From Swiss-Prot:
Family: Belongs to the nuclear hormone receptor family. NR1 subfamily.
Zn finger (NR C4-type) start-end: 32-52, 69-93
Subcellular localization: Nucleus
Gene: E75
A molecular function GO annotation: nuclear receptor activity
The name this protein goes by in its record: Nuclear hormone receptor E75
InterPro entries, per the entry: NHR-like_dom_sf, Nucl_hrmn_rcpt_lig-bd, Nuclear_hormone_rcpt_NR1, Nuclear_hrmn_rcpt, Znf_hrmn_rcpt, Znf_NHR/GATA
Lineage: Eukaryota, Metazoa, Ecdysozoa, Arthropoda, Crustacea
GO annotation (BP), single: positive regulation of transcription by RNA polymerase II
Amino acid sequence: MFCDQDMYEIPADCQVLVDKTVIEFDGTTVLCRVCGDKASGFHYGVHSCEGCKGFFRRSIQQKIQYRPCTKNQQCSILRINRNRCQYCRLKKCIAVGMSRDAVRFGRVPKREKAKILAAMQSVNAKSQERAVLAELEDDTRVTAAIIRAHMDTCDFTRDKVAPMLQQARTHPSYTQCPPYLACPLNPRPVPLHGQQELVQDFSEALLPAIRGVVEFAKRLPGFQQLPQEDQVTLLKAGVFEVLLVRLAGMFDARTNAMLCLNGQLVRREALHTSVNARFLMDSMFDFAERVNSLALNDAELALFCAVVVLAPDRPGLRNAELVERVHRRLVNCLQAVVSKHHPENPNLQRDLLSKIPDLRTLNTLHSEKLLKYKMTEHTAAGAPWDDSRSSWSMEQESSVGSPSSSYTTDEAMRSPVSCSESICSGESASSGESLCGSEVSGYTELRPPFPLARRRHDHSEGASSGDEATESPLKCPFSKRKSDSPDDSGIESGTDRSDKLSSPSVCSSPRSSIDEKERGGPARTICRCCARLQRRPSSTRICSWRKPTTSPIKSSVRNVGKRSLTPHSPPPPRSWSRRCLSLHSTRALWLRHTPPWPPVWRRPLA
């Protein structure tokens, strides 16, 4: 028989186990009350996973009586070992409140979910706070851990920098800098040499220093117990500030230079030219001079760096109160160390903490300079595109504003259209029919008007002189395609609404008209509805079914009057020739299923 629920006693470590498993999550996931796995929902009165839900359901439905536990019924039910002891697992299910009478149908209310998440976040925050405060109980141990982390992760401590700086001062060759111009007139890049090579080497050597700052922050007492989002926020905001505090000993106010890691000095003027940030470098030199005037040792610098990293006023912190408590404890440790080493200067800690706003200002300047540098790189990468667009717009204005203006041969070669394309007369260019003018609104958006090009006539063409040139505008290839291509259906596309408004006829297409001089006959248009070539004037609303006799596009429409399944435009039914006007009113219905420029004329549904 199934054992009754009263025979199971509630273990005392139930709530402790729940608190322990909650710590492993970020406070936004509901956990199983039995094994600590991710809960799938509210089952049998408690939040449980699918495994524990199915286990409890099978146990109560089949009335299974499990073998008693051989370990004094004290098995720890976790996700990794929940299947080892079924007796203790069922006991745990009943202990946390699972019952067949507590089955609820429907979804869990949002208000209840919010309460559960709030409770879990509260438990998580309290657990983290207890863990952090446990590491910060002993000030002596905290101070020793911070100093050890600083000495292990910093390659330019005071003990290491002092002999290097003394050696650099005694060798004047290190401080010699070749002459250079502040504003050179030659825009070509100057090759790196001397001081500029030192700056580049110093920049490359900063990568290990940045990794050292990150490692130093991870080894701070209480930092690993903070939420991961807060750790990332503190590192992003404090890496440059800690690096600047550490590099303060590398700035030499006596020689007005900065010591590189290879033992050489870089003058401030060389830094101005190399990094192109005069104000930022001057501010960094001034800050380093003020910090060096305090004569701090490595222990005091280590504690000051820890205070800078764990700043509670960083934007985006989730648990700012906990960071505030850690910050206050570190400030107390700094006060104890400063008072021990500088008893004659009681205001040293206040002067040291007053440098934090200066660090924030330098950090902001550095971020702005870095953003500007990235934008400059992006602009330099896209400079050819911008130049081409500007030259293209100039050619467009010249072609539209003055069609008769002349271009040189080099300018014509730079044009997007080669001079070997077909040439149309200046009269057609001025009228705007051969160019992609305002009438063809769809082409105007795709490509601007083509400029005029200078074409030279060879001696074989009968030119009077080899230097003689004839100015003629380049013919737009789209006009040739619209009149000569058999793929054109004459149907209005989505970009030709302006054509419809400006057209004098409902059935005529101005974008498919052919110049009379170019064709050698009367002007003809293609019907937009049935793709027929008209011989009547463009104002006629009824299509003409007579086959054209003289037309350059005769080969394109040679199958218009035939019933054949060719890749050319198939003819519509004959009744459509009398329904052109009615089709115009319903064209919007079937134009939605027709691409703007169909490769083959598609017959609409009757």
